[in-house]
């Protein structure tokens, strides 16, 4: 954090550098997370809802196959958003990895419920490009999911483009960003090109 803050001060007239990170909603750690955010003066946190309750024994939400598991994902995401700690919801369509082929009524209902929570709380959803970089390796692509994001558009939820940034190339690839921007044109004013803090 110190080096990032030093760079932010050094380049303050050229670029705005913020501090924050993606993290889970683990109920037992929310007080710790709130304290840590305040103590470190972080600008934002991103809700990346990957695991149910914890990452050691909890179910991975990218492996959802049943309606009951999907219900757990939605409940966890909504509870995380309701904490007020998070500035946006990362890859909200993560559950589509294994669940959504084809996108059934339970999947559509889950998407709608997530959208309604985000809209009520005024929290945008991320149109995450990470799987586009990963799919040449895994030979499968799960998100961003067009069916899911059509519901997001219909529900009037704000969206922004993001990547997991596991590799620097994910950030340095303007072609992927340009493609995503074109895909989000139907969102009109709901598409935001930056996180409003």
Q: What is each residue range found by the language model?
A:
Residues 1-120:
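Extended substrate/RNA-proximal surfaces in nucleic-acid metabolism proteins
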Residues 97, 102-197:
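Charged catalytic cores and adjacent phosphate/nucleic-acid-binding surfaces used
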């Amino acid at each position: 954090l110190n080096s990032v803050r030093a760079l932010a001060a050094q380049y303050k007239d050229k670029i705005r550098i913020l501090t924050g990170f993606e993290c889970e909603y683990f109920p037992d750690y929310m007080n710790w997370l709130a304290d840590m955010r305040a103590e470190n003066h972080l600008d934002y946190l991103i809700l990346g809802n990957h695991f149910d309750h914890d990452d050691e024994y909890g179910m991975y939400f990218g492996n959802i196959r049943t309606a009951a598991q999907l219900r757990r994902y939605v409940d966890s995401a909504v509870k995380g958003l309701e904490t007020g700690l998070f500035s946006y919801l990362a890859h909200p369509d993560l559950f589509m990895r294994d669940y959504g082929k084809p996108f059934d009524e339970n999947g559509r209902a889950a998407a709608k419920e997530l959208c309604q929570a985000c809209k009520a709380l005024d929290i945008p959803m991320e149109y995450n490009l990470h799987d586009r970089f990963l799919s040449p390796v895994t030979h499968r692509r799960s998100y961003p999911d067009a069916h899911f994001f059509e519901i997001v558009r219909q529900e009037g939820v704000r969206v922004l483009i993001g990547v997991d940034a596991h590799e620097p190339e994910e950030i340095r690839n303007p072609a992927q960003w340009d493609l995503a921007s074109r895909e989000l044109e139907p969102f009109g004013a709901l598409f935001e090109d930056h996180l409003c803090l």
